[in-house]
């Protein structure tokens, strides 16, 4: 008797709603991610330190509440978290164009909105990553992640160019208003999901500290997850510093117009789209395990193009670099996220994802703050070279691990990867 093939996700109603909602939401995130730094630089005259501080506050919540957020999300219905999260972010972001119209916009307000959106995003992202296994079967998880990543990369391709055009036409404040509309639409799509999660049993709750410890223990006790967390955390520490300074660097040191910057980012993001559609083939070619260190090395090395753009032709250098970075990051993420989703028991998914987010996103506000301080003190280009050196080092935990000898990744908790797990 043969096992029937799983139904196509194209015909899966609930996955389609999640997919459409996620796609609209990430388009909105691209708009605000492009427009808010421009607003700070062009309308409020922000310097390197202020740009670093803004980026720090955007991700600070992952460091401060990332761990308890996972335990809380495991106690709530994830669909509700997603719907309310998008609505909350939409309302917060709407205060920026409102303040601009009233001529009362300040850097202080940008900081407050960054913190508020960051707090909501912590809960939203943990619920979002934990929700897919609720809707699809285990063997469909990789396919679902691939489709979600393809949409996200499509948004990254079209988003910056579209945002640049909107900024040119409407200005950065009204472009952020478009983001609010996108997030409202996202909440509408997700609210149409028919699947009803089983309500967590309040009687089964344990002390918050115990649940947090359980999530951390799951991640840190697995030898492969430890390596992946170390690599991702170091990479995020470096890249957050780079990206905190990137818009200021592009507009001042490289003298790029905002439309040129948007096109460079959009064309570079084609690499991520190619990564989303080729990740399965690449994993089969080199092996699931090997795909992770190879993608990490490629994306880390490609970061060299950012400071090199100050001495080489800027546009082609950044374009090639962004193509390679985007491809490597997406292939890496699809492989490692699918691995941990397959490995983790469903009741632990929220805490596991929150623990990993805390460990790998927690360094981001630190990197952004250090990047801003160093950029103000030592200059943009020397700071970027230092951050890129750290990006190269970040691949070592997975490069010097059993992953480089593994074609297949473990799918069971008792298949803890060591040398015996290599194939």
Predicted regions and their residues:
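Alpha-helical transmembrane-bundle signature of multi-pass membrane transport and export proteins
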Residues: 1-423
């Amino acid at each position: 008797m043969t096992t029937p093939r799983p139904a196509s996700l194209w015909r899966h109603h609930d996955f389609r709603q999640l997919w459409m909602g996620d796609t609209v939401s990430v388009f909105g995130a691209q708009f605000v991610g492009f427009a808010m730094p421009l607003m700070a630089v062009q309308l409020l005259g922000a310097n390197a330190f202020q740009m670093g501080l803004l980026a720090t506050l955007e991700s600070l919540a992952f460091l401060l509440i990332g761990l308890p957020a996972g335990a809380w999300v495991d106690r709530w219905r994830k669909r509700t978290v997603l719907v309310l999260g998008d609505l909350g972010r939409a309302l917060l972001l709407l205060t920026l164009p409102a303040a601009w119209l009233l001529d009362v916009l300040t850097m202080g307000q940008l900081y407050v909105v960054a913190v508020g959106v960051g707090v909501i995003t912590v809960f939203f992202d943990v619920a979002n990553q934990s929700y897919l296994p609720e809707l699809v079967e285990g063997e469909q998880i990789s396919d679902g992640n691939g489709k979600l990543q393809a949409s996200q990369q499509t948004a990254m391709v079209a988003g910056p160019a579209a945002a640049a055009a909107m900024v040119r036409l409407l200005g950065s404040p009204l472009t952020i208003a478009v983001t609010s509309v996108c997030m409202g639409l996202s909440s509408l799509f997700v609210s149409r999901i028919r699947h009803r999660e089983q309500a967590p049993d309040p009687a089964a709750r344990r002390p918050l500290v115990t649940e947090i410890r359980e999530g951390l223990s799951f991640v840190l006790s697995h030898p492969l997850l430890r390596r992946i967390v170390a690599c991702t955390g170091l990479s995020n520490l470096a890249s957050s510093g780079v990206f905190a300074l990137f818009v200021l660097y592009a507009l001042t040191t490289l003298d790029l117009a905002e439309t040129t910057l948007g096109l460079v980012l959009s064309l570079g993001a084609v690499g991520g789209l190619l990564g989303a559609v080729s990740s399965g083939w690449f994993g089969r070619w080199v092996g699931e395990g090997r795909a992770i260190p190879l993608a990490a090395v490629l994306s880390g090395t490609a970061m060299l193009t950012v400071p090199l753009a100050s001495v080489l032709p800027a546009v082609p250098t950044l374009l090639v670099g962004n193509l390679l970075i985007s491809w490597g990051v997406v292939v890496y993420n699809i492989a490692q996220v699918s691995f941990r989703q397959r490995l983790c028991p469903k009741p632990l998914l929220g805490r596991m994802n929150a623990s990993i987010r805390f460990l790998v996103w927690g360094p981001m506000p630190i990197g952004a703050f250090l990047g801003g301080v160093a950029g103000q003190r030592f200059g943009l280009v020397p700071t970027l070279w230092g951050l890129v050196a750290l990006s190269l080092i970040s691949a070592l935990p997975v490069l010097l691990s059993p992953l480089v000898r593994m074609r297949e990744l473990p799918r069971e908790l008792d298949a803890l990867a060591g040398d015996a797990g290599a194939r």
